[in-house]
Each structure stands twice: as structure tokens, then as C-alpha cells.
Swiss-Prot record:
InterPro entries: RecA_dep_nuc (IPR031875). It comes from Escherichia phage P1. Residues 62-76 have a biased composition (Basic residues). Keywords: DNA excision, DNA recombination. Signal peptide: none annotated. Gene3D superfamilies: 3.30.40.190. It comes from the Viruses. The lineage of its organism: Viruses, Duplodnaviria, Heunggongvirae, Uroviricota, Caudoviricetes. This is Recombination enhancement function protein.
Length: 186
């Protein structure tokens, strides 16, 4: 009976042999002048069809509309400054600040903007939150075990800023804790 290592090694040998066969077939095909000529002919035919199609098409109108300048970036907010980007990178490297407060470390975070995305300095006010603290409600059985695991953005009837603040800390208190953990002077 083969061990797992032997099976893995056998599988690797089969893969290597298959790869070498495929490479040999490809080299053989590329060396065949008949195949190469057929590929060149296929390319020429495609170009001829494309040119004929362009000639059949009516000419474009002479007037061109000028590009309309986009006035709003929508929900994207404004571009962060270099300092805001530095702070956001430092905060993004932290674990979820709300989980950390309860002794749990969640390294997969998204940054939650406390003060919108367009105000001056708004990108300095971001909290590193896990998905359950940011905008998705944890499953009911998980919330039974961890009642403080509610999202800051309400997900249906679960969560919201008020409930989040009651079960954790205020966003500004969490921001101060995050700045302290990241050694950011504010």
C-alpha cells in the first residue's frame, strides 16, 4: 500500500510527463511549415474580413461631442492625501479594534469611515473593523456566544451605531485606542 507521500510523488511524475508531452507536441506543431502557413493564412483572412467590414460601414459623423467632466465621484469620496494614506495603512495593519477590546484577534479587516468620505481629514478617522463589526451581521448562533458582535452599519434589524456603541465603545473612543495601538500621534 502506498503512503500519501508516494502517491503525491507519483502524481507529480504524471503531471511532469504530461507537461513534457504537451511541450513536445507544441514544438512539433510549431516546427511544421504546413501548420505555420495555415496560421498565417488564417490571420490574413481575419484581417481581410475586418478591413472589408470597415469599408462597408458608413463614415462617422464629422461633429464630435466634447467630453463631459464628471462632477461627482459618487460614493467613492475624495482621494486621500499622502498623510491620510499613511494613517489608513497603519490602521489597516491592526486587528479589528472592537474584537480586540473583547480579547479576540480578527486580522481580516476593512476600514470604516467615521466622518464620511469627503470632509477634510475624513480619511484620518477610520476604524479597522472585521466584517461582523463593520456591515454584516454574524449568524445568530455566533451572536449568542459573542453578544457584542454587532455591525456598526445595521444589517436588517441587527446592529446600528447605537447598539454598536452600547455593546463596545463609541467610535471616537475606539479610534483613540486604534491610534494608540498604531503609534499615530493625533
Amino acid at each position: 500500500m502506498k503512503t500519501i507521500e508516494q502517491k503525491i510523488e507519483q502524481c507529480r511524475k504524471w503531471q511532469k510527463a504530461a507537461r513534457e508531452r504537451a511541450i513536445a507536441r507544441q514544438r512539433e506543431k510549431l516546427a511544421d511549415p504546413v501548420w505555420r502557413e495555415s496560421q498565417y493564412q488564417k490571420m490574413r483572412d481575419t484581417l481581410d474580413r475586418r478591413i472589408a467590414k470597415q469599408k462597408e460601414r458608413p463614415p462617422a459623423s464629422k461633429t464630435r461631442k466634447s467630453a463631459v467632466k464628471i462632477k461627482s465621484r459618487g460614493l467613492k469620496g475624495r482621494t486621500p492625501t499622502a498623510e491620510e494614506r499613511r494613517i489608513a495603512n497603519a490602521l489597516g495593519a491592526l486587528p479589528c479594534i472592537a474584537c480586540y477590546m473583547h480579547g479576540v484577534i480578527s486580522n481580516e479587516v476593512s476600514l470604516h469611515h467615521i466622518a464620511g468620505r469627503t470632509a477634510p481629514g475624513c480619511h484620518k478617522k477610520q476604524l479597522p473593523l472585521c466584517r461582523w463589526h463593520h456591515q454584516h451581521a454574524a449568524p445568530a448562533e455566533v451572536r449568542e456566544k459573542y453578544p457584542w458582535l454587532v455591525p456598526v452599519h445595521a444589517d436588517g434589524v441587527v446592529g446600528g451605531k447605537k447598539e454598536f456603541t452600547l455593546l463596545n465603545k463609541s467610535e471616537m473612543e475606539l479610534l483613540a485606542d486604534a491610534y494608540e495601538m498604531a503609534n499615530i500621534m493625533h
